């Protein structure tokens, strides 16, 4: 299995495992908000235009998330590009997703291969382009957020 699929599997399994631990702190039906950060390798950003990374994300990953949203597992997905570059933490794109609950993360990992097969009949092209997107990614990390009530 290529580097991307391995990384994706590890990320989803890792979130699923941590979901069991963190899920105990929240009710089962509480939405889960995760911020996914991407730092693009030098030369990968196109000033004033879309980056290759963004084009590949929109072509090969966003449709999968849209399908999960149609199925009710994801409540929202928003993509942000950093307007001003701070020194730390350095990131270029942030995706903020609100999942239905912790079990939605586990169900998504089960559904994903079937969704990829349905959306991308030429799996070799999809895998190659996702591999390229990850080659353009210098750093990636996720932050799982817990909302703190203000009242």
What label would you give each PLM region?
Residues 1, 15-17:
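Intrinsic disorder/low-complexity segments
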Residues 121-127:
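N-terminal secretory-pathway/extracellular module detecting exported/lumenal segments
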Residues 1-8:
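Bacterial N-terminal signal peptides that target proteins for export
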Residues 8-15:
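Core hydrophobic alpha-helical transmembrane segments of single-pass membrane proteins
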Residues 17-117, 131-151:
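Short S/T/G/P-rich N-terminal loop/turn motif that feeds into the first structured element of a domain
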């Amino acid at each position: 299995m290529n580097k991307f699929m391995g990384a994706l599997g590890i990320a989803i399994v890792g979130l699923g495992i941590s979901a069991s631990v963190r899920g105990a702190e929240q009710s089962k039906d509480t939405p889960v908000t995760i911020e996914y950060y991407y730092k693009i390798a030098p030369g990968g950003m196109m000033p004033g235009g879309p980056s290759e990374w963004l084009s590949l994300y929109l072509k090969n990953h966003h449709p999968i998330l849209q399908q999960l949203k149609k199925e009710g597992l994801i409540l929202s997905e928003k993509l942000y590009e950093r307007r001003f570059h701070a020194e730390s933490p350095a990131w270029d794109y942030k995706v903020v997703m609100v999942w239905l609950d912790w079990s939605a993360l586990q169900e998504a990992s089960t559904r994903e291969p079937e969704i990829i097969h349905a959306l991308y009949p030429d799996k070799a092209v999809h895998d190659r382009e996702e591999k390229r997107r990850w080659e353009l990614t210098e750093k990636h990390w996720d932050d799982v957020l817990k909302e703190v009530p203000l009242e």
